[in-house]
Amino acid sequence: MTEAMKITLSTQPADARWGDKATYSINNDGITLHLNGKDDLGLIQRAARKIDGLGIKQVALTGEGWDTERCWAFWAGYKGPKGVRTVMWPDLDDAQRQELDNRLTIIDWVRDTINAPAEELGPEQLAQRAVDLLCSVACDSVTYRITKGEDLREQNYMGLHTVGRGSERPPVLLALDYNPTGDKDAPVYACLVGKGITFDSGGYSIKQSAFMDSMKSDMGGAATVTGALAFAITRGLNKRVKLFLCCADNLISGNAFKLGDIIRYRNGKNAEVMNTDAEGRLVLADGLIDASAQHPQLIIDMATLTGAAKTALGNDYHALFSFDDTLAGRLLTSAAQENEPFWRLPLAEFHRNQLPSNFAELNNTGSAAYPAGASTAAGFLSHFVENYREGWLHIDCSATYRKAPVEQWAAGATGLGVRTIANLLTA
């Protein structure tokens, strides 16, 4: 068996022969990471990515200075979508080791689920995986209902049914209730709503290959909110939370939805489809209607919703939208505590009115006159939140997935956002 490469930490600079900007050096005992006190977690993550790039697949984190955050930073950079990596963790106290183990179980589940090929992960499989994860952490407190296919149409989940009907794999709504109180009449503290588009071709507004090749990851919002609920439970969440996952393929067929179709929702709103590639908001609307009906204190929806958010923030930040300044501030505080990147983008009352249609109350995409695509998408969603000005957060999760490796991440899913939402739920 190959001996594990020892990885140690030092606050001293590397030997001058390695250069004055060296973040790691190699010696007879292994590899030393040289911390400078400026961005130590980022330095560790970037160094781990380089170590993986050297083909080193077995490491032992040894010596002083390792804690949960530094171990996790190393793993975030070291983990990749191919091959097996083995880490021998340093001695941590029981609480730190439990926290690390929970991250390894749940956030790795999120990353692996998002990375799964669309052929292996359809709408039903995504819903079932979510149920399995949550049952693994709190099965006695979990009940759920899966509604799919024509049952969605019969129960008037018209956004989800319309988008998903073009695929041979039926669309699915997962409604999951985490109720640790044991009281079936206990108030619902929070609702989480996730976009679970397991493959997005764009429909008849078809994507080019360069924009379609990563669309197995278009269910990243659903995976992330599922992981967030599971992780919050491991941190002691004792309030009732409901999870709604809106799962579908967006494909082309003789039965697929078309431009000019009008979707009539249960809350009385109707929306004209002028871009079948703006499908995420159409399925989320059904989940938000259900979430609002619970009258929770907090609604969070999460979706890989717009290219506009990526244009603004790249893959480096999740975009946050809210009319509730206090709640947005709480989310950003949670993000800072968890060392996760969120950035608030504008959402104003006028964005709700920038989706004009000649034939319906709403258009599912903005016109050239209203180019703030991420904000108008959030404005669209607000029409399906009963009290949209208070207690609602929309996260356009641009940092969910990377098509290519960068200095701190392998290609694929990042798992970012799980800890922040869990932090907010348990604050």
Swiss-Prot record:
CDD domains in UniProt: Peptidase_M17
Molecular function, one GO term: metalloaminopeptidase activity
Residue positions of the active site: 207, 281
EC numbers, comma separated: 3.4.11.23
Family matches, as InterPro entries: Leucine_aapep/pepB (IPR011356), M17_PepB-like_N (IPR047620), Pept_M17_PepB (IPR008330), Peptidase_M17_C (IPR000819)
PROSITE patterns, per the entry: CYTOSOL_AP (PS00631)
Keyword Magnesium assigned: no
Cofactor(s) the record lists: Mn(2+)
Name the UniProt record assigns to this protein: Peptidase B
Taxonomic source organism: Salmonella choleraesuis (strain SC-B67)
Gene (UniProt): pepB
